[in-house]
Regions:
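Bacterial N-terminal signal peptides that target proteins for export
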Residues: 2-16
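Electrostatic cytochrome c docking/interface patches
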Residues: 34-66
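Composition-driven recognition of low-complexity segments enriched
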Residues: 27-29, 68, 82
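Residue-level "hotspot" positions that anchor or transmit function at local structural transition points
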Residues: 14, 43, 126-127
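Bacterial Sec-dependent N-terminal signal peptides
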Residues: 22-46, 183, 187-195, 201-204
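Bacterial N-terminal signal peptides
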Residues: 14-24
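Electron-transfer interface patches adjacent to heme c in soluble/periplasmic c-type cytochromes
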Residues: 70-75, 79-80, 84-204
Length: 204
């Protein structure tokens, strides 16, 4: 299995410094995401509908014993312009892609901000293995440092369940991230691009 999770830039000493300094020291500098490798992908539709909204939510975050409210996409966290959260960057203003519009071809979608969020998040995963994925482990502080502190108290958090489901249910081999196969397997009832809010996101 290809491991897509990125390592903490700067090695263990930089990671330790990040934890000590806190939320504004999760990383920094210009980030250039490496190209995706491997033949299996995660589902774009599920990401857009079920996972990306988590990054915009106001969440309770505990850092150095102090609990505050913030979003993952906030400046000082994982915002793509002012965030210091390492390679994982989120464009907070990314607009949903109309997957029912035939003009939105895969090539066009891959140039949009929502897709950039998708690739950035997928880069923090080990496809098919939520337990090994930094996108799950870091906000839970599961044997890994996270400059943003504890975001989710346990794996029972509904947000974690959605992220785990996304990672644990990759698109079938040989199909790309826009495969409509996932519309019926990852949503109830089946995802309808013309009425995206009519379906519920499946989760573990």
């Amino acid at each position: 299995m290809t491991k897509n999770a990125r390592q903490f830039p700067g090695g263990p000493f930089a990671a330790a410094s990040c934890a000590i300094i806190g939320l504004t020291a999760c990383g920094g500098g210009t980030v250039s995401d490496p190209p995706l490798t491997g033949t299996q992908h995660l589902a774009f539709a599920y990401f857009q509908q079920c996972v990306n909204p988590i990054f915009q939510k106001q969440l309770q975050i505990t850092l150095n014993g102090v609990t505050t409210t913030n979003t993952c996409a906030a400046g000082g966290c994982h915002d793509n312009t002012s965030g210091t959260g390492g390679a994982f960057r989120i464009i907070g203003a990314a607009q949903p892609v109309d997957l029912a519009n035939p003009a939105n071809t895969p090539d066009l979608i891959r140039a949009l901000d929502m897709y950039k969020n998708f690739i950035s998040a997928q880069g923090e995963t080990v496809i098919g293995s939520p337990a090994q994925s930094l996108l799950v482990r870091k906000p839970l502080l599961q044997n890994v440092l996270h400059g943003g502190g504890l975001v989710f108290a346990s794996n029972l958090d509904p947000n974690v369940k959605l992220i785990e489901y996304w990672i644990g249910n990759p698109v079938p081999q040989g199909q790309d991230e826009f495969s409509t196969t996932t519309y019926s397997t990852m949503f109830t009832p089946a995802f309808n691009p013309s009425s995206p809010n009519s379906s519920t996101c499946n989760s573990f």
